[in-house]
Amino acid sequence: MIPIQLTVFFMIIYVLESLTIIVQSSLIVAVLGREWLQVRRLMPVDMILISLGISRFCLQWASMLNNFCSYFNLNYVLCNLTITWEFFNILTFWLNSLLTVFYCIKASSFTHHIFLWLRWRILRLFPWILLGSLMITCVTIIPSAIGNYIQIQLLTMEHLPRNSTVTDKLEKFHQYQFQAHTVALVIPFILFLASTILLMASLTKQIQHHSTGHCNPSMKAHFTALRSLAVLFIVFTSYFLTILITIIGTLFDKRCWLWVWEAFVYAFILMHSTSLMLSSPTLKRILKGKC
């Protein structure tokens, strides 16, 4: 059991992190949305960032409400909020993976004809790919929705005589729900890993090819991109692992360590959100023009 003062401290840290992420997400959507209305078109990277901003905005509010309901044992409200959090969490993972795929397709120097064909097709169909990620999320959330319904049924049966066979089946399906959610996160994470490794290999190859003993502007740009990619890789991998541990939920007494753990998790999410803000040329150009 941790002291109440420490619990309050980490609760405040978590709330401040969450509000910062919400403000960042709102800023991304507002700035890029305004640009979209003015020029009537956006680059694919900005389409992803707007989608990510909306998804992360909803995810963060769902997370805050979910955690406070969990802490104060509001179980019926918690069940309804959990499915919302899971939906936007899976969608956020897919959108992050698509962003990395876009950078890999756009910036890598591979010249194989299959890769060039994929680049042409993906860039041409990017709005439909975004819609596809939303549809995949809707499909993968179905087991969680069923598990959420089962959880509510288990809560209503808590004070009633139970049929042990039925209860065991319900609890087994509830465990399957967590496995399905884990798989739904692992697939886009593998896509992220593959795209990141390919892009890092391509950038390293370009640096070695253009190395002439002195640092020209092209070399500096490649070094900067490689460094940014390495930071994004570390932050997103840490984010994935912390979310995975949160889903498994077997490490800590959830009520006792809730705010310590959430403050730790959302520190990574805040770093990732900040790095995404800095990845959009359009966003950086507009914000610099306002200063």
UniProtKB/Swiss-Prot annotation:
Cytoplasmic face of the membrane: 23-41, 106-125, 204-228, 279-291
The keyword Glycoprotein is assigned to this record = yes
List of glycosylated residues: 80, 163
Gene Ontology molecular function: any one = bitter taste receptor activity
Q: Which UniProt keywords apply?
A: Cell membrane, G-protein coupled receptor, Glycoprotein, Membrane, Receptor, Sensory transduction, Taste, Transducer, Transmembrane, Transmembrane helix
Taxonomy, superkingdom: Eukaryota
Compartment annotation:
Cell membrane
A single Gene Ontology CC term: trans-Golgi network
**The protein's assembly and partners:** Interacts with RTP3 and RTP4.
PANTHER family membership:
TASTE RECEPTOR TYPE 2, TASTE RECEPTOR TYPE 2 MEMBER 16
Family membership: Belongs to the G-protein coupled receptor T2R family.
- Record function comment: Receptor that may play a role in the perception of bitterness and is gustducin-linked. May play a role in sensing the chemical composition of the gastrointestinal content. The activity of this receptor may stimulate alpha gustducin, mediate PLC-beta-2 activation and lead to the gating of TRPM5.
Task: Supply the name of the protein.
Answer: Taste receptor type 2 member 16
Q: What is the lineage of its organism?
A: Eukaryota, Metazoa, Chordata, Craniata, Vertebrata
